[in-house]
């Protein structure tokens, strides 16, 4: 909730952790009290998380470029993977720590201290807070690698927090944490329709969300820790993951600022024409005659004609396919996890003979179907597409990694972080080399400049531990 943009990490953490009394001393205004409740903090953290994951503002988020769904028209630094000019890694780090994790932590402390809440209300609210916290921690790990974790939210004790090992400390702990709260959704009473903007207080839906997040955690580990991966995935499925698009973890944005989808701000309100569809995704979809093209892209070049801009080059806004009309709508929903994503995870699990209650073909088809339906395709579109020899799971070329990876990546359009992560995990589809820099797709964000300058010793140790603070350093789970 608190938009205190201080470029130095340690200071931003200090100010984010200040008590309400301290805020009163700084900002005392009897007509505008600064005391905030746990539900307001939870709602604010929720929106901050969705906004950061949805935005395509290159000052904050370049994941849609990293996934090569979009490419740029005039200013092409970011599509050539230069993130230093705008301190993008610092912005993402600060947003996720300060405006998401600290607000969630503050909300947690207020729930615990609120004597008016019943034990069931505390249990449910704390479970909701925990799920969004775990989601955010995983996102940070999957962006940077090792990060400050055990010391990160204890600023009075640790002004310069140490980094934790993502493989041996953070991921196992996140799995333990989500295991500890899943059962609480059965009896707990969460934030209701006012505070909970995702499910409006539906705890059954939250339990599916938690299990689907647990599934994601487990699938990330399949190549590096197959034993933990199997047990995590199978227990998540047994407890109940998403089974339709009705389960999707969405934030329905509103038509008026400041509650519109950030995409609308970037693409419409700004009046700018910074992005077109990248040739990477357009070429693949054209080859497959993909029915999602009229939803993903505009037909501004011509009827049923789709042209992608060369990735990493300066591209014409008028002669390349523009981003689809849905992405220009102020109310277009943001997504944290959806049924299509869950289905592709289950397809991989089935290929690995995990006990998940279906075949790889069934889950693969479910993932494609869910994506086409979500974007507005018809039943005939789905039937014809699945029958295409290059889409049909039995006949499509390549290994299961290529089949699942390519269709999974296509389904994550507009969810740049997951699209980038799918490519890192499965190594498909084949990405383009950026035209101007001739650099390949980065494998991680480098650590923020402020960490390098201010938290030097801990940054040095973390950099050495992961194999170097470089865009080409693989994350611990990316071993293929």
Where do the language-model regions lie?
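Positively charged n-region of N-terminal signal peptides that target proteins for export
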Residues: 1-4
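Sec-dependent N-terminal signal peptides
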Residues: 6-10
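Membrane-proximal, proline-rich intrinsically disordered regions
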Residues: 17-68, 74-77, 84-87, 98, ...
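Short acidic (Asp/Glu) and glycine-rich catalytic loops that position anionic groups and cofactors
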Residues: 21-24, 323-324, 381-387
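Structured, solvent-exposed acidic/aromatic patches
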Residues: 35-39, 73-379, 394-401, 407
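C-terminal functional modules
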Residues: 372, 376-480
């Amino acid at each position: 909730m608190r938009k205190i943009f201080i470029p130095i990490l340690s200071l931003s953490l200090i100010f984010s952790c200040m008590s309400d009394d301290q805020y009163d001393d700084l900002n005392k205004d009897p007509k505008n009290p600064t005391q905030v409740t746990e539900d307001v903090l939870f709602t604010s953290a929720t929106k901050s998380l969705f906004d950061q994951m949805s935005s395509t503002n290159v000052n904050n988020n370049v994941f849609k470029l990293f996934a090569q769904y979009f490419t740029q028209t005039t200013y092409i630094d970011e599509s050539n993977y230069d993130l230093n000019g705008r301190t993008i890694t610092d912005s993402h780090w600060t947003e996720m720590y300060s405006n998401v994790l600290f607000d969630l932590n503050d909300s947690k402390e207020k729930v615990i201290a609120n004597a008016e809440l019943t034990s069931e209300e505390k249990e449910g609210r704390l479970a909701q807070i925990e799920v969004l916290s775990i989601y955010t921690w995983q996102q940070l790990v999957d962006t940077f690698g090792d990060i400050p974790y055990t010391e990160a939210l204890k600023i009075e004790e640790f002004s310069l927090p140490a980094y934790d090992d993502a493989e041996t400390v953070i991921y196992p702990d996140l799995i333990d944490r989500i295991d500890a709260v899943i059962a609480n959704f059965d009896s707990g009473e969460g934030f209701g329709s006012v505070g909970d903007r995702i499910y409006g207080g539906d705890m059954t839906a939250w339990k599916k969300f938690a299990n689907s997040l647990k599934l994601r955690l487990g699938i990330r580990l399949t190549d590096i820790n197959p034993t933990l991966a199997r047990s995590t995935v199978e227990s998540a499925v047994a407890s109940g993951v998403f089974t339709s698009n009705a389960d999707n973890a969405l934030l329905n944005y509103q038509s008026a600022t400041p509650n519109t989808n950030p995409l609308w701000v970037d693409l419409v309100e700004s009046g700018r024409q910074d992005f077109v569809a990248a040739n990477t995704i357009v070429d693949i979809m054209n080859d497959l005659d993909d029915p999602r093209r009229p939803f993903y892209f505009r037909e501004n070049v011509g009827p049923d004609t789709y042209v992608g801009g060369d990735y990493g080059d300066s591209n014409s806004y008028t002669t390349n396919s523009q981003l689809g009309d849905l992405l220009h709508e102020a109310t277009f929903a943001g997504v944290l996890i959806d049924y299509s994503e869950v289905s592709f995870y289950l397809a991989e699990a089935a290929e690995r003979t995990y006990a998940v209650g279906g075949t790889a073909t069934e889950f693969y088809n479910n993932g494609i179907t869910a994506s086409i339906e979500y974007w507005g395709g018809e039943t005939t579109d789905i039937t014809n597409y699945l029958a295409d020899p290059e889409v049909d799971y039995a006949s499509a070329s390549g290994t299961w990694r290529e089949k699942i990876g390519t269709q999974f990546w296509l389904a994550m359009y507009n969810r740049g972080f997951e699209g980038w992560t799918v490519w890192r995990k499965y190594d498909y589809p084949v990405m383009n080399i950026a035209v101007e820099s001739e650099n390949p797709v980065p494998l991680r964000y480098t650590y923020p400049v402020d960490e390098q300058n201010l938290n030097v010793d801990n940054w040095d140790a973390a950099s050495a531990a992961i194999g170097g603070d470089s865009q080409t350093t693989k994350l611990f789970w990316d071993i293929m």
